[in-house]
Amino acid sequence: MGRRKVEIKRIENKSSRQVTFSKRRKGLIEKARQLSILCESSIAVVAVSGSGKLYDSASGDNMSKIIDRYEIHHADELKALDLAEKIRNYLPHKELLEIVQSKLEESNVDNVSVDSLISMEEQLETALSVIRAKKTELMMEDMKSLQEREKLLIEENQILASQVGKKTFLVIEGDRGMSRENGSGNKVPETLSLLK
């Protein structure tokens, strides 16, 4: 007799749901461990219970190494997607420039109508405004990041200045303490005359 098929749907009873989560989580982690051993691979499992408790397990490598590799790979994918989007955005501009170039070649100058030239001019102005808007956006982002960096540097400078001020104050107070008489009535000896 085989196992009966369980319908996959939300378990209404809270305690049954928690027990099922615990058992299946343990089974998932065990399967991940077995896969790691069998295939000599690094596997990370992260599960969050309905109550918000985090469970994680790593096989093959430690969790931080696996997550670092994932982040590097994910960043590369995002760069590739960003590059593909930029290419898609620039293709119409490239095609437009090719059309303008072909229309303005000497052999085609006689065949270009005024309406066609006006249309090309409007398309070029539209493309130029899009490019200028993107340029402005990028410049604003750069300016914002530079302002944030400036703010951080000013805060760091203030912290360092206050630390230097405290050290200077301690040195000055220390010098004053050295020049005063100590409790027994004897003066603290001054530095050697050779060192002055």
Swiss-Prot record:
Main location (coarse class):
nucleus
Q: In which tissues is it expressed?
A: Mostly expressed in roots, leaves and flowers, and, to a lower extent, in inflorescence, siliques, pollen and shoots.
Q: Which Gene3D superfamilies is this protein grouped with?
A: Transcription factor, MADS-box
Q: Which residues form the K-box domain?
A: 80-170
- Which keywords are on file for this protein? DNA-binding, Nucleus, Transcription, Transcription regulation
| Compartments reported by the entry | Nucleus
What is its induction?
Repressed during vernalization. Regulated by HAM1 and HAM2 via epigenetic modification of chromatins at H4K5 acetylation during flowering.
A GO MF label: protein dimerization activity
Name a single GO cellular component.
nucleus
The family database entries (InterPro entries) matched by this protein are listed as:
MADS-box/MEF2_TF (IPR050142), TF_Kbox (IPR002487), TF_MADSbox (IPR002100), TF_MADSbox_sf (IPR036879)
- Motif stretch (Nuclear localization signal): 8-15
Please indicate which superkingdom the organism of origin belongs to: Eukaryota
Transcription regulation in keyword set: yes
Boundaries of every MADS-box domain copy: 1-61
Its Gene Ontology biological processes? negative regulation of flower development; regulation of photoperiodism, flowering; vernalization response
Pfam families assigned to the protein according to its UniProt record, in alphabetical order: K-box, SRF-TF
* Function description: Probable transcription factor involved in the negative regulation of flowering time, probably through the photoperiodic and vernalization pathways; more efficient in cv. Landsberg erecta than in cv. Columbia background. Prevents premature flowering. Involved in the modulation of vernalization impact on flowering according to genotype acclimation to altitude.
Can you name this protein?
Agamous-like MADS-box protein AGL70
Originating species: Arabidopsis thaliana (Mouse-ear cress)
